[in-house]
């Protein structure tokens, strides 16, 4: 069997396989690590067989995500051990951040652990596990480090969270809230647009409070104006995810309404509408305050699209409170809704609360709310039939009979809200084309390219 590495093997000949689990924020972190390693002279592998080292970026937001991360790591270890050549596994991200030193004994299959806030040191870690420590060709951390794959790019504008919601482990995994520096964000956006990206999606745990820790008055509205200026020469789009009700200031609403590059797509994960449940969750607001907020947004931004999230089965949630959430979803007719059953997470305040809702009740409530969400979402999608919209071409699907183009329009967040399927017409990936929407199915739309536009 081959040795782990030999003294004659150069880093430029060694390749890294990247496996990413979890949310878009993890995708961004993986992208940065990949860029650092490429900059340092490593290559990228497509599978375990062709890799010299395997890096798995893990998620630990929920117990189920932690289990998936560990199971995937063990599956990769089995695949590695079945090969003709040993290769190390490096576990990165949320699981090492959450469980720390406990993993050394529990996962002897893993050669190294890299916490979420240590990922800029990934080159030194890979050098070490491959026996390349001390070599020349270190990565440069001063530039904009992103690889460009696809027509849309997620850009993190912050790290961590200060909310400490009773159900959420993120502050314990990712730390306290910290805004990313404005110029660093703008430089990254510029690099991505120059590389052919058409849409920038700004993300963070709580995007609406960007800049609040700077103490100089800069805020998300200010940042959006700056990002819009960067994407404007490219006819690019800007989308913001993970806003909170308290962050929807008049200034921010005005920017979303008045700056053409900023899409009128608002993602506000409310979790619940009942004041008692929200207070128990460690969140603020009430059903009436949320009702007033959405009425204001719809009035000030005509035609806007709303996405939200519902969390059911939180400790102490009664059937009446769940029914109130169900009715609120029906009343508000959100365009897109994600639904989650409460997960009891170690280390969170809610994990020690009494009146834990039985698992079967949680799952039943989640399914009932999901049924409503899908009914409303399918209806909202169908209402767009007959519209003429701009569509970014994201790819080509030739899996069925014939070939169709796949894209998304302004009211569809990438990898989230469905797509536009175009069965005729010519375009290439990255093109922005004018499309007539002629049909819908579930969250998907069917369109026809308008010639000459």
Language model feature labels by segment:
Residues 1-210, 251, 262, 266, ...:
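Proteins enriched for Cys/Gly/acidic motifs involved in redox and nucleic-acid/cofactor modification
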Residues 60-65, 197-230, 243-251, 278, ...:
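Conserved glycine-rich "GG(E/T)P / GGGxP" loop and the immediately following alpha-helix
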Residues 215-226, 250-264, 317-334, 359-364, ...:
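Short, electropositive alpha-helical surface patch
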């Amino acid at each position: 069997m081959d040795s782990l590495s030999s003294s004659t093997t150069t880093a430029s000949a060694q390749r890294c396989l990247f496996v990413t689990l979890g949310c878009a924020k993890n995708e961004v972190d993986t992208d940065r690590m990949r860029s650092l390693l490429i900059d340092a002279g490593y290559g990228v592998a497509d599978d375990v067989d062709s890799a010299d080292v395997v890096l798995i970026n893990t998620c630990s937001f929920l117990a189920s995500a932690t289990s998936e991360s560990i199971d995937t790591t063990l599956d990769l270890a089995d695949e590695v051990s079945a090969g003709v050549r040993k290769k190390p596994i490096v576990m990165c991200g949320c699981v090492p951040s959450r469980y720390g030193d406990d993993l050394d004994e529990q996962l002897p299959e893993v050669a190294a652990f890299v916490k979420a806030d240590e990922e800029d040191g990934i080159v030194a870690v890979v050098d070490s596990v491959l026996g390349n420590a001390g070599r020349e060709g270190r990565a440069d951390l001063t530039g904009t480090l992103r690889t460009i794959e696809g027509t849309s790019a997620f850009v993190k504008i912050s790290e961590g969270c200060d909310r400490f919601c009773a159900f959420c482990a993120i502050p314990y995994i990712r730390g306290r809230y910290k805004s990313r520096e404005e110029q660093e964000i703008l430089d990254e956006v510029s690099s991505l647009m120059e590389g052919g990206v058409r849409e920038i999606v700004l993300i963070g745990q709580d995007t609406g409070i960007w800049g609040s820790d700077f103490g100089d008055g800069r805020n998300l509205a200010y940042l959006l104006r700056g990002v819009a200026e960067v994407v404007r020469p490219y006819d690019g789009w800007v989308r913001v995810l993970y806003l909170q009700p308290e962050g929807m200031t008049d200034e921010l609403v005005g920017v979303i309404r008045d700056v053409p590059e900023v899409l009128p797509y608002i993602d506000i994960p409310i979790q619940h509408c009942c004041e008692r449940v929200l207070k128990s969750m460690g969140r603020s607001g009430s059903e009436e305050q949320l009702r007033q907020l959405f009425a204001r947004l719809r009035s000030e931004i005509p035609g806007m699209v709303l996405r939200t999230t519902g969390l059911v089965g939180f400790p102490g949630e009664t059937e009446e409170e769940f029914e109130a959430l169900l009715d609120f979803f029906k009343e508000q007719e959100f365009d897109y809704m994600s639904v989650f059953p409460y997960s009891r997470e170690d280390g969170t305040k809610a994990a020690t609360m009494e009146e834990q809702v039985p698992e079967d009740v949680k799952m039943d409530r989640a399914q009932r709310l999901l049924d409503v969400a899908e009914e409303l979402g399918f209806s909202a999608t169908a209402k767009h039939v007959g519209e003429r919209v701009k569509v970014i071409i994201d790819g080509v699907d030739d899996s069925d009979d014939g070939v169709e183009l796949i894209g998304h329009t302004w009211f569809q967040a990438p990898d989230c809200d469905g797509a536009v399927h175009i069965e005729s017409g010519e375009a290439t990936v990255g093109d922005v084309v004018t499309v007539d929407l002629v049909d819908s199915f579930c969250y998907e739309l069917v369109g026809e390219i308008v010639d000459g536009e």
